[in-house]
């Protein structure tokens, strides 16, 4: 089956790819070295890109995560500018960063299940 992918989905995937390239090749801030973009969603009108990220080996409440969040917020304009230069879009979307807690939540649930299964009755 050959299903066509919607334009917002294609743009979101390309923004994710572009942001990963920028983070790993062009960003010199050491607070962003372990940042990994997990997902990008874009509004239907392509004006807002919601970017979810994690930090390898770090919990959201840890200091390195807080530092990375601040660095991403500070560099939002740079990321938007680079997306505009690298992608052929009529309007460069506003970039909004959010820490992705899915992996942490899954790990916590897995831990709870493990404890429940191995608890002595």
Curated annotation (Swiss-Prot):
Q: Name one GO biological process term.
A: maturation of SSU-rRNA
Keyword Cytoplasm in annotation: yes
Asked whether the UniProt record includes Cytoplasm among its keywords, one would answer: yes
Sorted alphabetically, which Pfam families does this protein's record hold? RBFA
Q: Which UniProt keywords apply?
A: Cytoplasm, Ribosome biogenesis
The domain of life for this entry's organism is Bacteria
- Provide the primary localization: cytoplasm
Q: What are the annotated disulfide bridges?
A: none
Compartments annotated for it: namely: Cytoplasm
One molecular function GO term is:
ribosomal small subunit binding
One GO CC term of this entry?
A: cytosol
Look up the coiled coil feature and give its residue ranges: none
NCBIfam families hit by this protein: rbfA
Q: How does it assemble?
A: Monomer. Binds 30S ribosomal subunits, but not 50S ribosomal subunits or 70S ribosomes.
Quote the function comment for this protein. Answer: One of several proteins that assist in the late maturation steps of the functional core of the 30S ribosomal subunit. Associates with free 30S ribosomal subunits (but not with 30S subunits that are part of 70S ribosomes or polysomes). Required for efficient processing of 16S rRNA. May interact with the 5'-terminal helix region of 16S rRNA.
UniProt family annotation: Belongs to the RbfA family.
The protein in question is named Ribosome-binding factor A
> Which species does the entry assign this protein to?
Hydrogenovibrio crunogenus (strain DSM 25203 / XCL-2) (Thiomicrospira crunogena)
